[in-house]
């Protein structure tokens, strides 16, 4: 076997944690997580183009403030000089923005790959390598035979609970719990109004 022989409770807990993380990602949203990763990258990165972009943006703001403070009719030469400087800064900012957007795209791809590796890959590995592992047993006689048979699907003897049923149960519980927690914060739906017929 390629993977180590794990204790059933280790598999049980690790799959539970992976499914909880997967539900958290689904609830929060990949785009929100990617935006958070990008903001963290902006804070910790020593990338020169980001620093240049921030300084040029501040410089453009100052130039526009000075431009608004003077009258174009009274001080035409100074206003024109500031206007040219603002146009030049805007062009430089646009070029830097394209570079930064390319970096953001690569950061988004990396964070998307990390989310995929953390939430999907462990589930598929467990499904392939631990599908015949008995996670726990149910005492005989608690459920009817057909329920024991369903709980043992797809590869286990009656009375055993395997990975497939465990994942199904955990997914159901975690998604219902997530719904209960997020429901009060969901956007409120307005009460429908009946259309009145005009005759």
Curated annotation (Swiss-Prot):
InterPro entries in the record: Get1 (IPR028945), Get1_fungi (IPR027538), Helix_hairpin_bin_sf (IPR029012)
Keyword flag Ligase: no
Assigned GO CC terms: endoplasmic reticulum membrane; GET complex; Golgi membrane
Coiled coil: 76-116
Ranges annotated as spanning the membrane: 12-31, 116-136, 161-177
Cytoplasmic compartment spans: 32-115, 178-199
Keywords: Coiled coil, Endoplasmic reticulum, ER-Golgi transport, Golgi apparatus, Membrane, Transmembrane, Transmembrane helix, Transport
Compartment(s) of residence: Endoplasmic reticulum membrane; Golgi apparatus membrane
UniProt family annotation: Belongs to the WRB/GET1 family.
UniProt name for this protein: Golgi to ER traffic protein 1
Recorded name of the encoding gene: GET1
